[in-house]
Swiss-Prot record:
It is a single-pass type II membrane protein. The lineage of its organism: Bacteria, Pseudomonadati, Pseudomonadota, Alphaproteobacteria, Hyphomicrobiales. It comes from Rhizobium meliloti (strain 1021). Residues 1-12 are cytoplasmic. This is Cytochrome c oxidase assembly protein CtaG. InterPro entries: CtaG/Cox11_dom_sf (IPR023471), Cyt_c_oxidase_assmbl_CtaG (IPR007533).
Length: 198
């Protein structure tokens, strides 16, 4: 009988260990999924890692000092697009609101959807690069062979001249990478699809 009690305790102990390990693994998987959106939110709020700021209105102050902004375009594997800036660089007055264009073309024989991510280098300048309008705020769907010009309206915040780490910056690079994405579906369509599975 003593052996039965000892075996029961050992079995319960093993069950607790297995349950703890499974909870730990589930927690780690959950944290892995949560890390990307949390880090993205942190970067958008702080401008960390070259993330630009999204604003509703233009700057009230325009300085005489100019800064060169260069434009870069990339397409991730799996998205059959040609994507380029219409112009490679521009000299702008700090605080001046400017519109530039990027051009994308779908090279596939089917509609494709992409979402652009962006950053600014040097990274210290990301917090001072303000976008008023950008194609990167939403996903973009192109029909087969369709070509589209996409605007970016931005300004460099006059505050960039104050911090020591950004005072000597004379050139910024705005870089975009388009990634493939499944097109978003309206909520009613998703709900109807879920009900059909039941």
């Amino acid at each position: 009988m003593a052996d039965n009690g000892q075996a029961d305790r050992k079995e319960r102990s093993n069950g607790v260990i297995v349950g703890t390990c499974l909870a730990f693994v589930a927690g780690m998987i959950g944290m892995a999924y949560a890390a990307v959106p949390l880090y993205d939110m942190f970067c958008r709020v702080t401008g960390y890692n070259g993330t630009t700021q999204r604003v509703e209105q233009a700057s009230d102050l325009i300085l005489d000092e100019k800064i060169k902004v260069t434009f870069d375009a990339n397409v991730a594997a799996g998205l059959p697009w040609e994507f380029v800036p219409v112009q490679r660089d521009i000299d702008v007055r700090i605080g001046e609101t400017v519109q530039i264009m990027y051009r994308a073309k779908n090279l596939a024989s089917t509609p494709t959807t992409g979402q652009a991510t962006f950053n600014v280098t040097p990274m210290a300048a990301g917090a001072y690069f303000n976008k008023v309008q950008c194609f990167c705020f939403t996903e973009t769907t192109l029909e087969p062979g369709e070509e589209m010009e996409m605007p970016v309206v931005f300004f460099v915040d006059p505050e960039i001249v104050k911090p020591v780490e950004t005072q000597g910056i004379k050139t910024l690079t705005l870089s975009y990478t388009f990634y493939p994405r499944e097109p978003s579906k309206p909520v009613a369509q998703v709900k109807a699809k879920a009900e059909n599975k039941l």
